[in-house]
A protein has these predicted regions:
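A short, acidic/glycine-rich surface segment
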Residues: 30-32, 99-104, 226-227, 298-299
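Ordered, small/hydrophobic-rich secondary-structure cores
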Residues: 35-50, 56-143
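Bacterial N-terminal signal peptides
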Residues: 9-20
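Short hydrophobic/aromatic beta-strand micro-patches
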Residues: 49, 117-119, 180-182, 243-245
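Vicinal oxygen chelate
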Residues: 26-39, 127-175, 180-181, 204, ...
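Bacterial N-terminal signal peptides that target proteins for export
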Residues: 1-11
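Core segments of cupin and vicinal oxygen chelate
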Residues: 47-91, 148, 180-223
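Helix N-cap motif at beta-to-alpha junctions
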Residues: 53-54, 120-124, 185-186, 246-249
Length: 303
């Protein structure tokens, strides 16, 4: 399977963006204080771009991590979008695109989307899957003050993945995905995710694995966690990003312009598909992509 770098269909655009998108004018509607009230899907999705053979990524995330592989979208032009279910979220994969920077490696080596965390009830099952898939067994450490275990591994493209074993936890935790962002300025980034995106801010926590504090924000079964290791790290703006499904993307466009948020790809419509989109950058250039689908639009109209 060969993956390309441009998207030509609805759900693929959620991941990639597309030059075929046509600008649309924003209608005058009531102002919103943040994107929070417009979030329709009770989770967020995440995407990662890669340079290795796609089968290597599929083996790691499917066979070893145990994520359910969903239909891969063939969007034409030799372009495909691979999708995996992680609880109520989707993790999506595509080839790298130009005009973005890529810095594989550890969580503290660059700003950007640096870590994905998945939660499991049973250590032995995880180890068995890794070994059966031909990988070394993850090395788990105790999480101080809890009954949990944690292991840090790297996917075939050099991206960090944390595996947390949490026995006897509520099912909601096993449906949760934690998206770890390394940022250059915690105060600025916290304000962005709290005040612009409108996520629920959780109390800060000590993070013994990375010897720092982490600041987390929650929406449904997705947690966005911020860490900082200084202001002088190189910026990885291409490896990954976050996608939100909203009821009114035009309101997001107006809010972004009002707040001075960087717009990477402007408010657009994919002709032939019930999809309107806008791509924004957070203060470190990490993609925050907002999509209004036919389903979310109909849900808003029915209210």
């Amino acid at each position: 399977m060969k993956l390309g770098s441009s998207a030509l269909s609805g759900l693929a655009v959620v991941l990639l963006g597309c030059a075929a998108l046509q600008p649309v004018a924003a209608e005058e509607k009531a102002a919103v204080e943040s994107a929070g009230p417009l979030l329709w899907q009770p989770s967020m999705n995440v995407f990662r771009r890669f340079a290795v053979e796609p089968e290597e990524m599929f083996k790691f995330y499917g066979d070893a991590l145990g994520l359910e592989q969903l239909q891969t979208f063939d969007v034409g032009g030799g372009t495909n979008v691979a999708r995996f279910r992680a609880g109520r979220s989707e993790v999506k994969f595509t080839r790298r695109v130009p005009d973005r920077t890529y810095v594989p490696g550890a969580v503290d080596e660059a700003t950007g989307l640096r870590l994905l965390t998945f939660f499991y009830p049973d250590r032995d099952q995880v180890v068995e899957r890794f070994v059966a898939a031909g990988y070394d067994a993850p090395v788990f450490e105790e999480v101080p003050g809890t009954d949990r275990l944690s292991a840090l591994v790297y996917d075939p493209d050099g991206h960090a993945v944390e595996i947390v074993i949490a026995p006897n936890a509520p099912q909601e935790l096993y449906d949760t995905i934690e998206v770890g962002l390394t940022v250059s300025d915690l105060d600025v980034s916290r304000a962005f995710y709290r005040e612009f995106v409108g996520l629920e801010e959780l109390p800060p926590q000590d993070d013994p694995r990375f010897d720092t504090q982490k600041y987390s924000f929650k929406h449904g079964t997705t947690i966005v966690t911020l860490r900082s290791f200084g202001a002088d790290l190189p910026a990885d703006t291409g490896t990954g990003g976050i996608q939100y499904v909203v009821t009114d993307v035009e309101a997001i466009d107006r809010l972004a312009k009002e707040r001075g948020v960087t717009i990477d790809q402007p408010l657009s419509e994919l002709r032939g598909f019930a999809l309107r989109t806008i791509w924004l950058d957070d203060p470190d250039g990490i993609t925050n992509y907002f999509a209004q689908t036919g389903a979310s639009r109909r849900a808003a109209a029915a209210q």
